[in-house]
C-alpha cells in the first residue's frame, strides 16, 4: 500500500513531466478526480491521469541495458513509491541524471548505483497531438488509429487467415483426387492416406479458425472498451446546455447505439472482409481449372454489388426513421417513469397508454418496413446466387461431357467457387448491419462531436476568497431567444449574505448559472476575485461553490456517501457537523442504519424535506467559499427551516452566500437584497431600505406575503 507521501510524489512527477511537454496542470483537479487523499495513486491511476491531461503514457518493463534507447524524460517506477524522473543518460551509459520529486533536486548516479535502485519498471511519456478535452471528428475514420495501434495483432489475424484459406484450398483438391484417381483405380490405400490427411487438415482448420476468432474478438473488445470509456468521459464533459436542449430519452437512445457498433465489431463482417481479400488466390486456381466457369463467377460479383447499392438508400431511410421513432419511445418512456407520481395522482394513465400504443404502433410499422426492405435485399442475393449455381452446373456439365474437364475438377471448382462466393454472400447479408452501424456512428457522433466545456490554460489557480462582480452582463439562452439578463452590474464583497428576489422568470436562477459557468455571457464579464470566469477552469470554480437547489437529486447510495460525494476524503466528524448545520443529524440518527442507510434511486426512501436537508449538508461539507441557496428552503417544513435559519449565522460565516427566494422572510436579514425584474436589477438595498419605499417592487411583494 502506497503512503500519502508516495502518492504525492507520483502526482508531482506527473506535473513535472506535463510541464516539460508544455501542458499546464492543476494539481488539485487531479487530486479531486482520482481521490488521492484517501486512495493510492498507482500505475493505473497515473496512466489515466496522464491521458486526461493530454499526455500519451505507456507502462513497460525494460531490462536495464535497454534504457539507453528509450525516449527521455521518462518516469522510473518503484514499488516503494520513491519514483525518479530519468532525464539524461551519457553516451557511454556511465552516468544517469535523474530528478527526485521527493527531495525536489537533481541527482547523478553511476551505472552501478542506478542499476541497484532500478526495478525494471518505467513509464514512457510523450505529448499527444490533439488538444486536451477535444476529440477528433467521430465517424468511420475514428477507427483508423485503433487499427494502427493494434496493427501487430491484426497482422497475426491476417497471417492466421492466410493459413485458413490455404487449408480451404487443399480441401477441393482432396475431393478431385478421390473422384478422378481413387474411384477410377479403386485405390483403397490412397483413399486411407487422403482421409487421414483430410482429418488433419480439418483439425488444423478448426484450431486456426478458433484462434482467429479469439484474437479478433479480444482486439475488438479492447476497441469497444476504449470507445465506451471515451463516450462516457465525453458525455460528462459536455456543457449543461447540451442536456437542457435534449430530452433524456434521446440522449440515452444515442448512447445505446454503442451496442450496435459493438455487435458489428465482434460479428462476422470484418472476418468476411479478410476472407474476401484472399479470394484472388482462389480465382487464380479456378482460372486454371476453367476460364469459362471462372468468368461466370466473376461476372456475378458486380450483380451482388449493384443490387446492394440499389437496396442501400431505401434501407438507410427506413433505418433512420426507425431510430427516430425508437428515440421518441425512449424519451416518452423515461418521461413517464420519471413523472409516475404525477401520472398516478392525476389519473391520466389511460391517456399515457393511448399515446404509448400509438407511438409503439408507429415503431413496429417502421421496423416492419426495415425488415421488408432487408428481406427483399436478401432474397435478391439468393436469386443471384442460385442463378449462378444453375449456370455453372449447366456449363460445367457441358465441359465434362465434351471432355474439357473431369468430374473431379468440376466438383473441386464448385467447392472453390463456394469459398469465393461465401464471404460475398455473408457481406451482402450483413449489409443491413453495416447500414445500421452507419446510423449508429452518425447518432453517436452527435454526442462525441459536440465540443466539451473549455478548460483553463492556467497552471495554478488560487483558492476563491468570495469577491463577485458582474460587469455589463447580457445573456440569453439562444442567439434568437429572449434576453434573460440585461446590463447587469453587481458587486458582492466576500463574506456578504445577498438575497435575490423577484417575480418568476425575472432571471434570478440564470444569474447563479452564469456564476457556476454553466453558460458564458453574451456580453460583459463575471469576475471572482478578479478572475474572469470565461477563462477559468469550471472544475476549479465548481469545487469551491456549494449549491442547493429547490429540487436536489440524491444518488442510490448511503447517506454518508451522498453527503461526502464531492469530497470523499472528509472525516466522519466533518460530515456529521455539516449534517447538524443542515438540521439533518437528528433524523439520520433515528434511522435504523443511520448514516449507512441507502436512500434509494433519487432519494425516494426519504421525504422531500429530508432529501433537502441532506443536500444542504452535501453543499456545506466541502466548506465552499461561495454558497448558493436557490429556493433551497421552500420544500422544508417550518421546523426544519427554523433549524437552518437558527444555524444561518454559522453557515454563512467566512463565506459569500447568495440566497434566491420567493419567501421574503428568508432574506430579511441579508446584508443586501437584490430585486430582479424582467432581466434587470430594479432595486438594491437592505430590507429596511427597500420596505420603506412604498412604490418599490420589494415592498409590494412583501405586502402580498404579509
Curated annotation (Swiss-Prot):
<comment type="similarity">
    <text>Belongs to the ABC transporter superfamily. Protein-1 exporter (TC 3.A.1.109) family.</text>
</comment>
<dbReference type="GO" id="GO:0006508">
    <property type="term" value="P:proteolysis"/>
</dbReference>
<feature type="domain" description="ABC transporter">
    <location>
        <begin position="468"/>
        <end position="703"/>
    </location>
</feature>
<feature type="domain" description="ABC transmembrane type-1">
    <location>
        <begin position="154"/>
        <end position="436"/>
    </location>
</feature>
<keyword id="KW-0813">Transport</keyword>
<keyword id="KW-0812">Transmembrane</keyword>
<dbReference type="GO" id="GO:0015421">
    <property type="term" value="F:ABC-type oligopeptide transporter activity"/>
</dbReference>
<feature type="transmembrane region" description="Helical">
    <location>
        <begin position="153"/>
        <end position="173"/>
    </location>
</feature>
<keyword id="KW-0067">ATP-binding</keyword>
<protein>
    <recommendedName>
        <fullName>Alpha-hemolysin translocation ATP-binding protein HlyB</fullName>
    </recommendedName>
</protein>
<dbReference type="InterPro" id="IPR010132">
    <property type="entry name" value="ATPase_T1SS_HlyB"/>
</dbReference>
<dbReference type="Pfam" id="PF00005">
    <property type="entry name" value="ABC_tran"/>
</dbReference>
<dbReference type="GO" id="GO:0008233">
    <property type="term" value="F:peptidase activity"/>
</dbReference>
<feature type="transmembrane region" description="Helical">
    <location>
        <begin position="295"/>
        <end position="315"/>
    </location>
</feature>
<feature type="transmembrane region" description="Helical">
    <location>
        <begin position="191"/>
        <end position="211"/>
    </location>
</feature>
<feature type="active site">
    <location>
        <position position="83"/>
    </location>
</feature>
<feature type="transmembrane region" description="Helical">
    <location>
        <begin position="269"/>
        <end position="289"/>
    </location>
</feature>
<dbReference type="InterPro" id="IPR003593">
    <property type="entry name" value="AAA+_ATPase"/>
</dbReference>
<dbReference type="GO" id="GO:0005886">
    <property type="term" value="C:plasma membrane"/>
</dbReference>
<dbReference type="InterPro" id="IPR011527">
    <property type="entry name" value="ABC1_TM_dom"/>
</dbReference>
<feature type="transmembrane region" description="Helical">
    <location>
        <begin position="388"/>
        <end position="408"/>
    </location>
</feature>
<keyword id="KW-0378">Hydrolase</keyword>
<feature type="binding site">
    <location>
        <begin position="502"/>
        <end position="509"/>
    </location>
    <ligand>
        <name>ATP</name>
    </ligand>
</feature>
<keyword id="KW-0614">Plasmid</keyword>
<keyword id="KW-0472">Membrane</keyword>
<dbReference type="InterPro" id="IPR017871">
    <property type="entry name" value="ABC_transporter-like_CS"/>
</dbReference>
<keyword id="KW-1003">Cell membrane</keyword>
<keyword id="KW-1133">Transmembrane helix</keyword>
<dbReference type="InterPro" id="IPR039395">
    <property type="entry name" value="Peptidase_C39-like_A"/>
</dbReference>
<keyword id="KW-0997">Cell inner membrane</keyword>
<dbReference type="InterPro" id="IPR003439">
    <property type="entry name" value="ABC_transporter-like_ATP-bd"/>
</dbReference>
<dbReference type="GO" id="GO:0030253">
    <property type="term" value="P:protein secretion by the type I secretion system"/>
</dbReference>
<keyword id="KW-0547">Nucleotide-binding</keyword>
<dbReference type="InterPro" id="IPR036640">
    <property type="entry name" value="ABC1_TM_sf"/>
</dbReference>
<dbReference type="GO" id="GO:0016887">
    <property type="term" value="F:ATP hydrolysis activity"/>
</dbReference>
<dbReference type="Pfam" id="PF03412">
    <property type="entry name" value="Peptidase_C39"/>
</dbReference>
<comment type="function">
    <text>Part of the ABC transporter complex HlyBD involved in hemolysin export. Transmembrane domains (TMD) form a pore in the inner membrane and the ATP-binding domain (NBD) is responsible for energy generation.</text>
</comment>
<dbReference type="InterPro" id="IPR039421">
    <property type="entry name" value="Type_1_exporter"/>
</dbReference>
<dbReference type="InterPro" id="IPR005074">
    <property type="entry name" value="Peptidase_C39"/>
</dbReference>
<dbReference type="GO" id="GO:0005524">
    <property type="term" value="F:ATP binding"/>
</dbReference>
<dbReference type="GO" id="GO:0030256">
    <property type="term" value="C:type I protein secretion system complex"/>
</dbReference>
<dbReference type="InterPro" id="IPR027417">
    <property type="entry name" value="P-loop_NTPase"/>
</dbReference>
Amino acid at each position: 500500500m502506497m503512503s500519502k507521501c508516495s502518492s504525492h510524489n507520483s502526482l508531482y512527477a506527473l506535473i513535472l513531466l506535463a510541464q516539460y511537454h508544455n501542458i499546464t496542470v492543476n494539481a488539485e483537479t487531479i487530486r479531486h478526480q482520482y481521490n488521492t487523499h484517501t486512495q493510492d495513486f498507482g500505475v493505473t491511476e497515473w496512466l489515466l491521469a496522464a491521458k486526461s491531461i493530454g499526455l500519451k503514457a505507456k507502462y513497460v518493463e525494460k531490462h536495464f541495458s535497454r534504457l539507453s534507447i528509450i525516449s527521455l524524460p521518462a518516469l522510473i517506477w518503484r514499488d516503494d513509491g520513491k519514483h525518479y524522473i530519468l532525464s539524461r543518460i551519457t553516451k557511454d551509459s556511465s552516468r544517469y541524471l535523474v530528478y527526485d520529486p521527493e527531495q525536489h533536486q537533481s541527482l547523478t548516479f553511476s551505472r552501478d548505483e542506478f542499476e541497484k535502485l532500478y526495478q525494471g519498471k518505467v513509464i514512457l511519456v510523450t505529448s499527444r497531438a490533439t488538444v486536451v478535452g477535444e476529440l477528433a471528428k467521430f465517424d468511420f475514420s475514428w477507427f483508423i488509429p485503433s487499427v494502427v495501434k493494434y496493427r501487430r495483432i491484426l497482422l497475426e489475424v491476417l497471417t492466421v487467415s492466410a493459413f485458413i484459406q490455404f487449408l480451404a484450398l487443399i480441401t477441393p483438391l482432396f475431393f478431385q483426387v478421390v473422384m478422378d484417381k481413387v474411384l477410377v483405380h479403386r485405390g483403397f490405400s490412397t483413399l486411407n492416406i487422403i482421409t487421414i490427411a483430410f482429418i488433419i487438415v480439418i483439425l488444423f482448420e478448426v484450431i486456426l479458425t478458433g484462434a482467429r476468432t479469439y484474437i479478433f474478438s479480444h482486439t475488438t473488445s479492447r476497441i469497444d472498451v476504449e470507445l465506451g470509456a471515451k463516450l462516457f468521459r465525453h458525455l460528462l464533459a459536455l456543457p449543461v446546455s447540451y442536456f437542457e436542449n435534449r430530452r433524456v430519452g434521446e440522449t440515452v437512445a444515442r448512447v445505446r447505439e454503442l451496442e450496435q457498433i459493438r455487435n458489428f465489431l465482434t460479428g462476422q463482417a470484418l472476418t468476411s472482409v479478410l476472407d474476401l481479400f484472399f479470394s484472388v488466390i482462389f480465382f487464380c486456381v479456378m482460372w486454371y481449372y476453367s476460364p469459362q466457369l471462372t468468368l461466370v463467377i466473376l461476372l456475378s460479383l458486380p450483380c451482388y454489388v449493384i443490387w446492394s447499392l440499389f437496396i442501400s438508400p431505401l434501407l438507410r431511410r427506413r433505418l433512420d426513421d426507425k431510430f427516430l421513432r425508437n428515440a421518441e419511445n425512449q424519451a416518452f418512456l423515461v418521461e413517464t417513469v420519471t413523472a409516475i407520481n404525477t401520472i398516478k395522482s392525476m389519473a391520466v394513465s389511460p391517456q399515457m397508454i393511448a399515446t404509448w400504443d400509438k407511438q409503439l404502433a408507429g415503431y413496429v410499422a417502421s421496423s416492419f418496413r426495415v425488415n421488408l426492405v432487408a428481406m427483399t435485399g436478401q432474397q435478391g442475393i439468393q436469386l443471384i446466387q442460385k442463378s449462378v449455381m444453375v449456370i455453372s452446373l449447366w456449363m460445367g456439365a457441358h465441359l465434362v461431357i465434351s471432355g474439357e474437364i473431369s468430374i473431379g475438377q468440376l466438383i473441386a471448382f464448385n467447392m472453390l467457387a463456394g469459398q469465393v462466393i461465401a464471404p460475398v454472400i455473408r457481406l451482402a447479408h450483413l449489409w443491413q448491419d453495416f447500414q445500421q452501424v452507419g446510423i449508429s456512428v452518425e447518432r453517436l457522433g452527435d454526442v462525441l462531436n459536440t465540443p466539451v466545456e473549455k478548460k483553463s490554460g492556467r497552471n495554478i489557480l488560487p483558492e476563491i476568497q468570495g469577491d463577485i462582480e458582474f460587469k455589463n452582463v447580457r445573456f440569453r439562452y439562444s442567439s434568437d431567444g429572449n434576453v434573460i439578463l440585461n446590463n447587469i452590474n453587481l458587486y458582492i464583497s466576500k463574506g456578504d449574505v445577498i438575497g435575490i428576489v423577484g417575480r418568476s422568470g425575472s432571471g434570478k436562477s440564470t444569474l447563479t448559472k452564469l456564476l457556476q459557468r454553466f453558460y458564458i455571457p453574451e456580453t460583459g464579464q463575471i469576475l471572482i476575485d478578479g478572475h474572469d470566469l470565461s477563462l477559468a477552469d469550471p472544475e476549479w470554480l465548481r469545487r469551491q461553490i456549494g449549491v442547493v437547489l429547490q429540487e436536489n437529486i440524491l444518488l442510490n447510495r448511503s447517506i454518508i456517501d451522498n453527503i461526502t460525494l464531492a469530497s470523499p476524503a472528509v472525516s466522519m466528524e466533518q460530515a456529521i457537523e455539516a449534517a447538524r448545520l443542515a438540521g439533518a443529524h437528528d433524523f439520520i440518527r433515528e434511522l435504523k442504519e443511520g448514516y449507512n442507510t441507502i436512500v434509494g434511486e433519487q432519494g425516494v426512501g426519504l421525504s422531500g424535506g429530508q432529501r433537502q436537508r441532506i443536500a444542504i449538508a452535501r453543499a456545506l461539507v466541502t466548506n465552499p467559499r461561495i454558497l448558493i441557496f436557490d429556493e433551497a428552503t421552500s420544500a422544508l417544513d417550518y421546523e426544519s427551516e427554523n433549524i437552518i435559519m437558527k444555524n444561518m449565522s454559522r453557515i454563512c460565516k467566512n463565506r459569500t452566500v447568495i440566497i434566491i427566494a420567493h419567501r421574503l422572510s428568508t432574506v430579511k436579514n441579508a446584508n443586501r437584497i437584490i430585486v430582479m425584474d424582467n432581466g434587470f436589477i430594479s432595486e438594491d438595498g437592505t430590507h429596511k431600505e427597500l420596505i420603506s419605499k412604498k412604490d418599490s417592487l420589494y415592498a409590494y411583494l412583501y405586502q402580498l406575503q404579509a
